[in-house]
Amino acid sequence: MAPHETNETFAVFDGHLIRKVVPRRGQPYEHRCPRPSLERVAHAIDELGDEGFTIHSIAEREDLPSTQVAVALAFLRERGIIETHYRHGYAATQVGVHLDAMTEYHALAENG
């Protein structure tokens, strides 16, 4: 593992998407994103279409905490639904982000 890489895993518990991170240096941490927030992020991406976005632009647009948006975007990126676009931005890899996001969320909830 390179110096700045992390071990990142996702789980679903009690209606929340949980992102657990174990950095190579520092303390492990976790952040949560309620399912309704994940849905709002996914719908916002669908509405943006081909337009790129950042954590902060989605957080501001949807009036959500940036940590919840960061969890949602990390999950969508890990599942191949969005990709990194330039240094701090993202772009959808396909149409139907909400449908794919909910499919992946429920699969994770059922299968771990």
How would you name each of these model-derived features?
Residues M1-P36:
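Long, low-complexity, charged/polar intrinsically disordered regions in eukaryotic proteins
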Residues R32, G52, D63-T67:
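Intrinsic disorder
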Residues R35-E51:
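Short helix->loop/beta-hairpin flanking segments within DNA-binding domains
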Residues L48-R61:
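Short acidic, hydrophobic short linear motifs in intrinsically disordered regions
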Residues D63-E78:
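Short amphipathic alpha-helical interaction segments
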Residues R77-H88:
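A short, conserved structural fragment
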Residues H88-V95:
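Minor-groove-contacting beta-hairpin "wing" of winged helix-turn-helix DNA-binding domains
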Residues V95-G112:
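Short, amphipathic alpha-helical interaction segments positioned at domain boundaries
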